[in-house]
Amino acid sequence: MTAAAYIAGDWGTSNLRLRLCAADGTALESRQGPGAAEARGKFAAVLDGLTADWNARRPALPVFLCGMAGSTFGWLEAPYLPCPEELDSVAGSLARPRPGVHIVPGTRCTNPLGAPDVMRGEETQLLGAFAVAPQLERGRQLVCLPGTHTKWASLHDGTLLEFLTVPTGEVFKLLCDHSVLVRDRDTPIEHHAREFERGLAEAAKHPGVPVLHRLFQSRSLRLDQQLSAQGAASWTSGLLIGTDVAGTLPLFAAHGAETPVTIVATKSLCELYAAALARFGRRSVAVAGDDAAFAGLARISLLSEPGVAA
């Protein structure tokens, strides 16, 4: 039987994913728990409760955590590392709330718009993506990590130069849950590919017009019976993602249109962003995001002080 070497955890705001891992990163067991918002003030108790049986079988397993465990409301704040940052070097700056527990720091930069920007958790996903797509460690690369707060990361030879955060997912959720523009409360949020493509087309038709000037179309098109109530959310998603892509690509023009954009996300999000990038003439390659954080934690466990995951 393969021996357990360490425990890995991706501690998001709303969910905790834990894996018992072998030395090579293979997941032996997995489980879930409360996110950082719910675990606030009791991180140690939550972790110990979820991993008690794992530690009973092999005491003193080292733990590697990424995400919000290192935030200002986390277990112990892991200060942001400034960009440019060689991503492998995060393994040398782990925060330790207690012996045996290691929290990956986030990164900060001045983004292409000249404003401060931060990421926490995505740096570990980027490290994990290196294992699946080694070309990311060579030359200039543009990586898209879609989500609630989509990150666009600029890399050069494995060094994170800068990044840009676009709250595309959060804006979409706010519009769906708290606005009359997209849907009535009784209308479910479903994906309709045709309406999503229509939203992308609208984003491409007037690329210089801000998204704020076009959001009301989600309602007016429905009232004019040019858009179904069921398809309005997908149309809005297409408009938002299309505008995200259209606004971002010029900011990272130094990467060149010939270099594919790497998308690190779930299969469904990869497909949506790939369609948007194609609409604006960019090729893309997809990396499964579900396991990227754990692949990154596996790499960090090997790069950290000798023997920590032995």
Q: Residue locations for each model-derived region?
A:
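Short glycine-rich, Thr/Ser-proximal phosphate-binding strand/loop in the N-terminal lobe
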Residues: 5-44, 287
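Short glycine-aspartate micro-motif
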Residues: 6-10, 62-64, 141-145, 262-263
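Glycine-rich phosphate-binding loops at beta-strand->alpha-helix junctions
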Residues: 15, 257-276
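N-terminal phosphate-binding loop and adjacent alpha-helix
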Residues: 26-62, 70-77, 181-184
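Glycine-rich phosphate-binding loop plus the immediately following alpha-helix
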Residues: 35, 39, 110-204
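Short beta-strand-loop/turn "lid" adjacent to the catalytic site in phosphate-handling enzymes
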Residues: 54-116, 157
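Adenine-nucleotide phosphate-binding core of ATP-dependent small-molecule kinases
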Residues: 204-247
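Glycine-rich phosphate-binding/hydrolytic loop that grips phosphoryl groups
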Residues: 275, 286-310
